[in-house]
Design a protein with these regions (language model features):
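Conserved functional hotspots at enzyme active or ligand-binding sites that engage polyanionic ligands
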Residues: 1-115
Length: 115
């Protein structure tokens, strides 16, 4: 499976205890030209917990937004660029959609990483 920056996917993502996993949506945030030779992706976790919205490192996706259907997300969600992970490709279950405008995500990443 070939995923690109801006793609949403369902992946087996570890719980905070690092012992169990849950199928969760993520957003691929790594540069497309990043070719490390390793079968992995850098992703931002996505949550449906809207209490996590409103921070400069997070981007809210509301289903009423005209671009929301292309994301493949099923409910209002928050992209958390302050919760990044590197996952192995074998943990990817499937792609579900994409975000066509990455400007807000890019700004959130700059806020998170101090760039």
């Amino acid at each position: 499976m070939s995923l690109k920056r801006g793609d949403f996917a369902l992946v087996y993502y570890p719980h905070s205890d690092l012992r169990t996993v849950k199928l969760r949506p993520v957003l691929v945030v790594q540069a497309e030209e990043l070719n490390t030779g390793l079968p992995q992706l850098i992703v931002a976790m996505v949550t449906s917990n809207l209490a996590r919205a409103g921070h400069p490192s997070r981007v809210t996706v509301l289903m009423k937004d005209p671009l929301a259907p292309e994301t493949g997300l099923k409910t209002d969600s928050v992209i958390m660029t302050d919760n990044l992970g590197t996952i192995e490709l074998q943990l990817v279950r499937r792609a579900i959609g994409r975000i066509s405008r990455m400007e807000a995500v890019d700004q959130a990443l700059r806020n998170t990483l101090g760039l």
